[in-house]
UniProtKB/Swiss-Prot annotation:
Keywords: Decarboxylase, Lyase, Magnesium, Metal-binding, Polyamine biosynthesis, Pyridoxal phosphate, Spermidine biosynthesis. Gene3D superfamilies: 1.10.287.3440, 1.20.58.930, Alanine racemase, Lyase, Ornithine Decarboxylase, Chain A, domain 1. InterPro entries: Ala_racemase/Decarboxylase_C, Arg_decarb_HB, Arg_decarbox_C, Arg_decrbxlase, De-COase2_N, Orn/DAP/Arg_de-COase, PLP-binding_barrel. Belongs to the Orn/Lys/Arg decarboxylase class-II family. SpeA subfamily. It comes from the Bacteria. It is an enzyme of class 4 (lyase). Its EC number is 4.1.1.19. The gene is speA. It comes from Shewanella sp. (strain ANA-3). This is Biosynthetic arginine decarboxylase.
Amino acid sequence: MNDWSIDAARAGYNVTHWSQGFYGISDQGEVTVSPDPKNPDHKIGLNELAKDMVKAGVALPVLVRFPQILHHRVNSLCQAFDQAIQKYEYQADYLLVYPIKVNQQKTVVEEILASQASKEVPQLGLEAGSKPELMAVLAMAQKASSVIVCNGYKDNEYIRLALIGEKLGHKVYIVLEKLSELKMVLAESKRLGVKPRLGLRARLAFQGKGKWQASGGEKSKFGLSAAQILTVVDQLKQEDMLDSLQLLHFHLGSQIANIRDIRQGVSEAARFYCELRELGASINCFDVGGGLAVDYDGTRSQSNNSMNYGLSEYANNIVNVLTDICNEYEQPMPRIISESGRHLTAHHAVLITDVIGTEAYQVEEIQPPAEESPQLLHNMWQSWTEISGRADQRALIEIYHDSQSDLQEAQSLFALGQLSLAERAWAEQANLRVCHEVQGLLSTKNRYHRPIIDELNEKLADKFFVNFSLFQSLPDAWGIDQVFPVLPLSGLDKAPERRAVMLDITCDSDGIVDQYVDGQGIETTLPVPAWSAESPYLMGFFMVGAYQEILGDMHNLFGDTNSAVVSIEENGMTNIESVLAGDTVADVLRYVNLDAVDFMRTYEELVNQHIAEEERAQILEELQVGLKGYTYLEDFS
């Protein structure tokens, strides 16, 4: 590509669109982060940052967090709603509630809470969906508005703890997911002498589209039907506690890509709100739940990995619909609450790691088959001679398909014992030569060529063996085909010479990234600079801040990675605020009830039985170091 430029790199990896301005490519071809939007010229080179951490003893892979991105995401969402409220003359305020299930890491929750420390009236609360999460938010919510929303299934202990939260000075909304929870809440509130703040989760008929659409609709796991909601109202009236019902909640599902789905869901829920107000309920909070999407691929579309709207459009639609329907019913406008965790956290974290080796197709010269070879091999040689002689463009596809068919036949004949191993190897090499030659002759401008170009890019792609576990660090890429932006951290000032796929170091064939963000959408391979052990480069996996850490598992006993918190000072200096060591081998063994101390005793017994005395101390030391070591690969010398 003689016309390659930095702008071509930015467009090719679509960085400008998925990064929201937080990440970019410098004129030197290095990936940078701009964590503080107030100072966009203050950038950190991720490649140099990683090298500095390695020099300081932080082994790769390392998850790097940028708390200033969290601050910006919180404040930009609040600002979008504040502007919408002003635009439509809405008569109530907005509260952002962070559901800690998205990322419960202490640093993340504390930084989100700190993002509004300077505000006289913080627009921030916390959501819990389990007893452990509730215990956490009870100790943290006072750092913001002290509002806590309790979702999820509940037992008496959960409810009692939530009510104790009221005694601690919090404003705790207990959202009823099941009809049976009401009886428990009423009983525990009487025992504690605490008036509960109740919420209802409405099960809407409308169902948004997307990977998590089962969270909404009539068959959703959570929520109350219209009839059950009326039962709750009747029971509260009988107890003279209808004024305890203060919040209406619904959830369309995570990552709602289409703004029309959000608008339609809010419209239905708004009528629930107004009808309940007319029945005498004192509801004053309207909780739209999650659903605010993240544009992982930067296409601004309705795909599962994108969104066709921005923050202002999201806030405007919610506020506009509520304003109109409340005015129609002549009911007061409620406080708007959203639980937008993915939007807050996705961009703030990037996994940086090294490529430990590659496997690439190398062009090899082939000789014509022996005269007595099967006719099939002669047919393949003919395909090669035709293509190497620069066949007519119209014949390219036919020759390619013939070669593919011949290869399949050769493999079948080998399985039947009618081809030798050497003949099969020759057939495979001949096919690869044809594929390589065809790849160079096809044109993306020809629409009939494009499917074959994609097929050949995948077939001839280099394999990059990358020092990470897909199951630990990007579990959604494996579990639900979530797309995450991936790109080399340096060398992007030169045209990419290869296409590659990223394979992790687990012993699992599913440990492969098979979708990559591209300027045109999603591809099955990634354009990369040539890699070698003499001129290696690092890889970055972006937008991994939501759900990935807590969902990650220990397949092959690869544990948590090292992590670091990095910010940029007012003077532009990089500040590595803290480093948290990842799991050691002993740590992950303990998770599965294997005791490293017992193992050392066993090692000593085996060493004494089998190792010469002069070697014993060294061998035992290496075994002990192994137990204390990082679960990922470190030593390539």
